[in-house]
Amino acid sequence: MKFSEQWVREWVNPAVNTEQLCDQITMLGLEVDGVEAVAGEFNGVVVGEVVECAQHPDADKLRVTKVNVGGERLLDIVCGAPNCRQGLKVACAIEGAVLPGDFKIKKTKLRGQPSEGMLCSYRELGMSEDHSGIIELPADAPVGKDFREYLILDDKEIEISLTPNRADCLSIAGVAREIGVVNQLAVTEPAINPVPVTSDEKVAINVLAPEACPRYLLRSVKNVNVNAETPVWMKEKLRRCGIRSIDPIVDITNFVLLELGQPMHAFDAAKLAQPVQVRFAADGEELVLLDGTTAKLQSNTLVIADQTGPLAMAGIFGGQASGVNAQTKDVILEAAFFAPLAITGRARQYGLHTDSSHRFERGVDFELQHKAMERATSLLVEICGGEVGEICEVVSETHLPKLNKVQLRRSKLDALLGHHIETETVTEIFHRLGLPVSYENEVWTVTSASWRFDIEIEEDLIEEIARIYGYNSIPNNAPLAHLSMREHHESDLELSRIKLALVGNDFHEAITYSFVDPKLQSILHPEQAVWILPNPISSEMSAMRVSLLTGLLGAVVYNQNRQQNRVRLFETGLRFIPDESAEFGIRQELVFAAVMTGSRLSEHWASKAEPADFFDLKGYIENLLSLTKAGPYIKFVAKEFPAFHPGQSAAIVLDGEEIGYIGQLHPMAAQKLGINGKAFACELIVDKVAERNVANAKEISKFPANKRDLALVVAENIAASDILDACREVAGSKLTQVNLFDVYQGQGVPEGHKSLAISLTIQDTEKTLEEDDINAVISVVLSELKDRFNAYLRD
């Protein structure tokens, strides 16, 4: 919003200069974007009167004038403006004057005729870009008076940027109110008295949408002179606020808009078929706007209409058919309160943005309409004359906004500000803001004002106190925080340790969205119920993920499409499983997931490129699980999953509970997802492996270790991990290590069987083991394996 400093000072005039005033406005939360002079730097320009005006003898477009500037004689001035005429009051730059751009006025001759000055246009004085003619001043302008003094041009245009909640400051009254509060000065409002009714003319009103228009006022003014001249003081105030003068009717409604913040409109009474209706548009209705464009109205658009159809978009734009023009004799003034939600977004639907819509969609004072109507009527009668009818009003008290009562606790105020403000000071600030307040039991009860739609919660009141008390008056105190060390159990396995282990194996951490494409998710989890968002960002992000793999595999596709074939990614995050027994019907689980594609090792001159396989990923996960307390008890049990290859997938099981899964992505699933080549993936619940093995010191044997290799033949459906576990169970403390180092099927091994080569390391902490001791351990192991798995030594 742009406004004139001088206009504001007519309402409230603090003893501060322009710079200090702008600082105050900014600290009030009304950020000052710019300050400009309302006119260029010039001197020597006075009010003059064209006494004579004749055609230049040698130039068709020039006129020779004699101008009275209050001196002893008339000045001869040659002028080329088309509107120069006898009797006109003008801005005259006399000899010695200096205009903007250091342009000096001297006596000269133009086409042979003497010229002792210059009649100025707005552009030549740096007041606007208007160069269509010379400035025309009122007939009562005092001849000889300094032009700067006459128009009070030692003024500044101040432009402020307002947040949407401060629509109350979209007017001179609103800005003055704020300045008055911070300077503890009373605001001097112009006298606005009821205009005497001189006509019995009434306007019939029918409000069909009271929820959208709780208050609607119309007033008839007959026999107005729409061709009257807008006073120069009004033109100047409008100009300094960035609004061009059009005609007195429009200028008056714009003036009231800027002064009080109430948008108004004027209809040509002769073009209305009463009653005037306030209703929503019917689909397909059309309205020709004042700018000549045609709007095809939508059913959610509030309109002002009569018996013939729409007259205007309510609170947005007037219609051409009912607009005021040079032939208008009788006008109907409109002032209304339109509910913000009824106007919000409607202008943008039609590619419009007007001063009225800007204010109505943010909220206008719902008690301002009568005052604005009287102000506009008074100005209209003063400038254009006319016979005034009574104000016709329809109001729905039920739908008018209710004043909020908000409580503010002393403890909350002190806590948020970090500073104690005296109770009397706080109460006084509320009174200065025009907010009724009471104080009892360390609590202020504040009633919002009709112009403040944004006072709703306790924090809003604290903001008001801080603004008016002054942010600079609140001391800078370092934040006081009562911190306590987070309890950390020695057995807790930090998530960062898991991540570092994977990073050490050439994996990269990824972060993907919790919102996923339900179509892609159904490829991986066709049987899993999912949580669909009611208002998604897009259709591709409309479901909550039930697995991290949906996002990770999408990241694989993204990288492969950019020529990255060897991809290793992992992620930790929440998955969301619909569960009626859980809070809000959804179970959130922290899980870990990893995916792997491409070669086993990075490209290197000393090694041959080999594709990664299921056992590579399984090895990485086993290495990861070895960090946990649960590691020795976790088993990989063959199991089929819909999205995995049936021969290369397994459940990760701990104490009989399935805590995750691992496998190669099914070729069909990979094809649907757009993945090239084989992809391997796993996922497991973090909480199940969140404990680590606490370091336990034990004696290191000083006696030699003995290694024995066994080649065992077992049925091919027996897991090697079961063989290794059985060895550990029966061999006792002397068995320090057992490893699988070869798997063989083929010649020499019966069909349906496989040969597992395992290495046993046997060692004692108290003596060197004899061969008999070693053989005893081997014998126990072989006996157990034969009994449990029908295993025997391969020949």
Curated annotation (Swiss-Prot):
It holds the Pfam family B5. It catalyses: tRNA(Phe) + L-phenylalanine + ATP = L-phenylalanyl-tRNA(Phe) + AMP + diphosphate + H(+). Keywords: Aminoacyl-tRNA synthetase, ATP-binding, Cytoplasm, Ligase, Magnesium, Metal-binding, Nucleotide-binding, Protein biosynthesis, RNA-binding, tRNA-binding. One of its GO terms (biological process) is phenylalanyl-tRNA aminoacylation. Residues 701-794 form the FDX-ACB domain. It comes from the Bacteria. It is found in: Cytoplasm. GO terms for cellular component: phenylalanine-tRNA ligase complex. Residues 401-476 form the B5 domain. Its EC number is 6.1.1.20. Its cofactor is Mg(2+). InterPro entries: aa-tRNA-synth_II/BPL/LPL, B3/B4_tRNA-bd, DNA-bd_dom_put_sf, Fdx_antiC-bd, Fdx_antiC-bd_sf, NA-bd_OB-fold, Phe-tRNA-ligase_IIc_bsu, Phe-tRNA-ligase_IIc_bsu_bact. Mg(2+) binds at D454, D460, E463, E464. GO terms for molecular function: ATP binding; magnesium ion binding; phenylalanine-tRNA ligase activity; tRNA binding. Residues 39-148 form the tRNA-binding domain. Binds 2 magnesium ions per tetramer. It is an enzyme of class 6 (ligase). Tetramer of two alpha and two beta subunits. HAMAP family: Phe_tRNA_synth_beta1. Belongs to the phenylalanyl-tRNA synthetase beta subunit family. Type 1 subfamily. This is Phenylalanine--tRNA ligase beta subunit. It comes from Mannheimia succiniciproducens (strain KCTC 0769BP / MBEL55E). The gene is pheT.
